[in-house]
């Protein structure tokens, strides 16, 4: 009897994967291995998802089913931020099965890939980002959420075997807006539907994500108090300037001129030097390397002191390691491999054709009570050397949220660890963690804005624990 059940299970899995293998979006494995000079035996899909009912908005996606037992593992949607930056950064630089060697166009296998424990879906969002296309015009946090839910529904309608599996959304940076707004759409979508027709959303894992109105909104941009506090605490600005900033922090919020602008400009100069100095400082990892790669037709931001302007005329964030992305994703052969349509523009890491993007001044903070009420677990992870969406801001709003919602502390602030490289050594400190009712705050020591890039092993450890709903030690 047990052998018969086992046989049926294997038959069921084989049938499901055979259905997938017939899908038109399946990437040619031999050609992928040839072009990328790798040896990957898993399935890869690349194509387009309908992001509106008319089908005029088409979002490019890549999907990596887990190579082993995919139907026994959860599905994770990964979104990068911007707004307007491609999620293929996540696939090829951070947590995909093969990633670029630092500063090169060469792939290497990622032993800490999230495909070890999950089925990974990457969607380029919103319109004009990466290979995605559609009607151009004003976009907003709200319209992006609508597009994303439509694309997600289309994905599960096509990959029906995965719809019943536990579903999680993860990402970083401005995905701190994308993820809660999409979760809100999923909650509304699921309302009144039978269990078989719902999206099985279980949790959100947001890295260095914009959340509070005081972080990434237009109102917060002129005087970035959380960034300035981060620089002050890390001795990147003088004590004299830091004290001046603290003295006026409340009156300078949202102020673009006068003494507030003078102080903001002083931070820029003390941290990065003047434009004449041409000092390249990496705000995404304050102790990290600053790469410079600007392909033809692209521009790199020269704003190094904090989060780049949302409407800045650039498609490459400062110091970003993008050589491999541009080398491959602008190749005609790779476009053919990934089944990229002629409607898709030349790929860029961040879109300069996004158009007018309207940022919600409320951020995504206002959605957290609804999400937690619907028993969707939240992991807020933060690299502690990121100056773009720094830990100072995250701890500010997490503390505020806990007090407002009276979230019980389940386990207090404490260190967490990863295994040592040598058996003779002790477990290694990976950061700090605090568990509240429905919400976990986790820091990653010496990681920047892109945690899975900077700390791959640590990312695998904490993500597996979150998926399994396990406490950290």
Residue ranges and their predicted role:
Residues 2-473:
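Terminal and linker regions of secretory-pathway proteins
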């Amino acid at each position: 009897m047990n052998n018969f059940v086992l046989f049926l299970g294997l038959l069921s899995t084989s049938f499901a994967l055979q259905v997938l293998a017939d899908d038109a979006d399946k990437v040619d494995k031999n050609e992928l291995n040839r072009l990328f000079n790798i040896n990957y035996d898993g399935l890869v899909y690349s194509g387009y998802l309908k992001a509106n009912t008319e089908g005029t908005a088409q979002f490019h996606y890549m999907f990596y089913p887990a190579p082993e037992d995919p139907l026994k593992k959860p599905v994770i949607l990964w979104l990068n931020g911007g707004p307007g930056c491609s999620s293929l950064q996540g696939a090829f630089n951070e947590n995909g099965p093969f990633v670029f060697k630092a500063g090169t166009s060469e792939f290497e296998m990622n032993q800490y890939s999230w495909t070890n424990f999950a089925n990974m879906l990457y969607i380029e969002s919103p319109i004009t980002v990466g290979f995605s296309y559609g009607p151009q015009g004003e976009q907003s946090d709200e319209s992006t959420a609508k597009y994303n839910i439509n694309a997600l529904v289309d994905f599960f309608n096509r990959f029906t075997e995965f719809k019943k599996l536990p579903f999680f959304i993860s990402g970083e940076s401005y995905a701190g807006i994308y993820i809660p707004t999409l979760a809100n759409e999923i909650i509304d979508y699921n309302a009144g539907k039978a269990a078989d027709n719902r999206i099985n959303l279980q949790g959100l894992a947001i890295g260095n994500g914009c959340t509070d109105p005081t972080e990434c909104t237009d109102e917060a941009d002129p005087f970035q108090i959380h960034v300035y506090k981060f620089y002050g605490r890390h001795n990147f600005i003088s004590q004299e300037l830091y004290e001046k900033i603290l003295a006026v922090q409340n009156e300078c919020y949202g102020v673009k001129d006068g003494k507030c602008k003078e102080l903001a400009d002083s931070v820029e100069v003390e941290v990065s030097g003047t434009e004449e100095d041409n000092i390249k400082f990496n705000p995404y990892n304050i102790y990290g390397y600053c790469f410079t790669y600007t392909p033809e037709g692209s521009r790199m931001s020269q704003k190094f002191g904090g989060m780049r302007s949302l409407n800045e005329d650039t498609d490459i964030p400062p110091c970003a390691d993008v050589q491999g992305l541009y080398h491959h994703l602008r190749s005609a052969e790779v476009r053919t491999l990934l089944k990229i349509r002629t409607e898709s523009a030349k790929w860029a890491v961040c879109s300069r054709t996004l158009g007018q993007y309207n940022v919600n001044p409320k951020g995504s903070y206002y959605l957290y009570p609804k999400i937690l009420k619907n028993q969707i677990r939240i992991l807020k992870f933060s690299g502690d050397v990121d100056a773009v969406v720094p830990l100072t801001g995250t701890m500010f709003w997490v503390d505020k949220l806990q007090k407002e919602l009276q979230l019980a502390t389940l386990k207090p602030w404490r260190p967490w660890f990863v295994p040592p490289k040598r058996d003779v050594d002790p477990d290694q400190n990976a950061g700090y963690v605090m568990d509240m009712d429905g919400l976990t705050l986790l820091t990653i020591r010496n990681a920047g804005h892109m945690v899975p890039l900077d700390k791959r092993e640590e990312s695998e450890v904490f993500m597996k624990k979150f998926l399994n709903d396990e406490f950290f030690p």
